[in-house]
Amino acid sequence: MNPRPGYRRSARSLEPMGLRSEVNRDVRLATPGEFAVPRIGPLEVWPPVVLAPMAGVTNAPFRTMCREFGAGLYVSEMVTARGLVDGHLKTTRLAHFAPEESPRSIQLYGTEPDSIGRAVDMLVGEGRVDHVDMNFGCPMPKVTRRGGGAAIPLKPRLFEAIVRAAVERSGDVPVTVKFRKGTDDDHLTFLEAGRIAEAVGASAVSLHARTAEQ
């Protein structure tokens, strides 16, 4: 797909041609080579912009459209590990990537280490993904009330077991972890979650700097 009109794109450059932010109009444009190329495991993320995963939004057509703007990584909408393991057709479709999509980045959600491990083993073993992002940020009350989503880091042992299951079954495919500050201001879990994720081998973490309540 051709870059968006007004941009000149190469493997490591995306140069605005006369376009400036209205907010940061006094900030100079970066020069080639000024910033090191960010890496997530073996993946180079350039330009250093990531399309954040969002259920019902970051599907294949939306990711295709966003590639015109030149982000370096496009994460799929949330896919449930249990649905993949059980072979649900709708879930399987969510885990599909177009031939031109690279790297193929999927966000996986689950509350059981076993199903997470099996789902990652399936995705990696079949060569279907280049990156797995673990979702611990869902703020929906119907999810957090049952101990899922953003509430999982409240249970450090479960959180560690889930992340470890993904990392141990991922082979050379990098695993990242997305989480929030916590469930509310009285239950902030992000520091411990980040330390645990690093300790068990996650390649990177992503912090949604709000609580689930917010």
Which residues are covered by each model-predicted region?
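N-terminal small/glycine-rich loop or linker at the start of catalytic domains
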Residues: 38-50, 82-103, 138-148, 170-178
